[in-house]
């Protein structure tokens, strides 16, 4: 236990915060290529077929990324933009694919909350 005098001189060293999105290497977004597009089931108590993709990032790391929204046009070799953000009921999925960027189309017929889904304003 340090004395008050030692604390005045040295102070406490803050522990560095651990990143939850290591594969992005400090970037907000990373480009990648889909190596496999498939569906998977969430953990209990939820039930669905969640759309996910294995993506090889430009940083050289392969990650599993969630495809948000209803319907998508992704297939193997599609170029996608990946952001951080986990999916709580899918273990190991810590990244999201950005809709409306690169090869990923926005969600069709989306009227509300369009920004996250790359949907243009309906005229």
UniProtKB/Swiss-Prot annotation:
This protein's GO CC annotations: small ribosomal subunit
GO biological process: translation
Keyword match Aminoacyl-tRNA synthetase: no
Keywords (A to Z) from UniProt: Ribonucleoprotein, Ribosomal protein, RNA-binding, rRNA-binding, tRNA-binding
Compositionally biased residues, Basic residues: 9-20
Cited InterPro entries: NA-bd_OB-fold (IPR012340), Ribosomal_uS12 (IPR006032), Ribosomal_uS12_bac (IPR005679)
Region ranges (Disordered): 1-21
An MF annotation (GO) of this entry: structural constituent of ribosome
Cysteines paired by S-S bonds: none
Subunit note: Part of the 30S ribosomal subunit. Contacts proteins S8 and S17. May interact with IF1 in the 30S initiation complex.
HAMAP family cross-referenced by the UniProt entry: Ribosomal_uS12_B
Its biological purpose: With S4 and S5 plays an important role in translational accuracy. Interacts with and stabilizes bases of the 16S rRNA that are involved in tRNA selection in the A site and with the mRNA backbone. Located at the interface of the 30S and 50S subunits, it traverses the body of the 30S subunit contacting proteins on the other side and probably holding the rRNA structure together. The combined cluster of proteins S8, S12 and S17 appears to hold together the shoulder and platform of the 30S subunit.
UniProt record similarity statement: Belongs to the universal ribosomal protein uS12 family.
Protein name: Small ribosomal subunit protein uS12
Gene of this entry: rpsL
